[in-house]
Every structure is written in C-alpha cells, then in structure tokens.
Amino acid sequence: MQQTLRKLDRAFNDMKSKGMGFPRYKKKIKSFNILGKISVEGKYIKMPLLKNIKFRKSRDIPEGFKIKQIQIIKKASGYYANLMIELDVNVVQPIPHGHAIGIDGGIQSMIATSDGLVLPRPKFLDKALRKIKLLQRKLRNKKKGSNKWNQLNHRIALLHEAVANKRKEYHFNLAHQLCDGVGMIFVENINFVSWSKGLFGKHSLDMGLGQFFNILEYVCSKKDTYFAKVDKNYTSQICPNCGTYTGKKDLSVRVHNCPKCQYIQNRDVAASEVIRSRGLENIAVGTTVNKQPSDGVLAGASA
C-alpha cells in the first residue's frame, strides 16, 4: 500500500511539473515491489511471505551493500527482478574539468556535438514495423481472449521488447563513446513530452532522446564526467562565433550562415556550440540553467 501511494503521488507531481497526462490505472501483473527482509543465497532469492525463488543472476551484489527492496516485473520474455541496494557512503559528484562538449538533440539527426559529430536518427522501430503490422492484421481476425489471440499478442509484445532492448543498448554504447576523453558535457533542458505530442512524435519516441539523456547523465556520473543542462531557448538562432542573433530558421535550412561574421557551419553543430558556450558561462557564474536577461539581450554566446 505504501509503495502504491508513493507511485500515485509521484504520478500527480509529474502531471503538474512535467506536463504528463492524468495518472492511469496499471495492471497489477505488470510489476510490484516487495519490502522487508530480502536476501540472495546462491541462485535463490528469499523474500517475505514467499518461498525461495530461483533466478538467473546478471551480476554479483557489491560487498557492503544491503538489499532494501525488490521489484518484480513481468515482460513478454519472462519475469525480472530488480534489486534496490543501498550503501551509506558520500558520493563525490564530478566537478568541471577537461575538454567540454555541447550536445544538440534533434529529429533529422539524433544528436550533434560541438566537436562536429553528427549522428543520423536511428530507426529502431522502422526495422521491425513490417513484422509488427503483419501480426496486428492477423490479430484483428482472431477472437479476443482466444488462444490464437493471446499467442499473437505475445509475439507482438516480444517484438516491441526487442526494439526497446536494442534502443537501450545503443543509448548506453553511445553514452560511453561520448564520455571517452571528455571532462564536461552540456545538453539542453528539453521537455520531451511535448516532442512526443508534436508532428514528429513517432520519430521522437522511436529515438528515445529523453531516455538517452538520462542514461548519459548516469554514465557521466560513473566516468567522472561533469554533466549539466542549459537553457534551450534560441540555441539555433545565435551565431556561436560572434554572438549575433540571426533569427528563426526554417527546419529545411540545415546550414548556419552568419550575415555578420560569415561563419558557416552545420545547423545542429552550431547549436551544440552555443550549448557548450552556455554551459561554460554557467560554470563561470555558478548557475546550472542560463536564462534570458530582462534587457532582451540573448545569453549563451561568446562575444
């Protein structure tokens, strides 16, 4: 009951602060948490009110950590157990140091960095979409609740789970690649919920930029790389070379061409350079998210 109330409270807070939808009921069979005395002995998990359950351990529990709770999750491929472990220790947060990069997220290209790296949008779902649509057409001809209907539903769920696993693996590999040889990473403070409701919502959800930035922040903390978010406004409308406001660009314009200093650069790379400049300026003045000054002068570009 306590866990359910915590989830409900978090759902209402997310609705108010992040613009998410009204909380919906979730099937009990999808996941549930267990508190109390939990221990792992060999290939078995011991939990309150339940028998010893055999499981396949993905990794050893680090020495000194205590198991606080366990989350049982039902997926198409089987049941999974997430162990929440705790250790009373002071975690040192990474400090700004070394080489800095800015990262701009987009639709046509997933990310562009201030070092010139531009990655096209990965199409995780598109590759499996033909199989999914074929199975969904077959599903329409089956009686709901029948064995054939359940079997087809299970096959569709397996395909969606495989797509999600590929997406997550790609995000982790990319995050590690970006952190190599870098001391600071800056990204925009974007509300990706609004992206998912826009014209390119399907592409946005397929890329999973919100998940990627969360994973990137986690990997940065593990690899001693400083991570911070900056103000997202006007990053594509400022020249990173001279700071001139160049005006709003149509999405079809893919090249930044400054009329004042003649600086020419890929539009997304130029935006990532502005993001990097804002991040470095925020460090200099001791803030995390830069705002537009009240006098109307746009912040985030070096003069």
Question: Locations of the language-model features?
Answer:
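Short acidic-glycine loop/turn motifs at beta-strand connectors
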Residues: 41, 75-76, 114-117, 242, ...
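Acidic carboxylate diad motif detector
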Residues: 1-73
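Generic, well-ordered alpha-helical scaffold segments in large soluble proteins
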Residues: 7, 11-14, 135-138, 177, ...
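Short amphipathic beta-strand/extended segments with alternating polar/hydrophobic composition
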Residues: 48-66, 94-97, 118-124, 264-267
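Substrate-contacting helices/loops that form the catalytic groove of nucleic-acid
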Residues: 67-69, 75-213, 284-303
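Generic recognition of long tandem-repeat/solenoid scaffolds
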Residues: 43-48, 79-84, 256
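Positively charged, low-complexity nucleic-acid-binding target-recognition regions
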Residues: 92, 203, 207-303
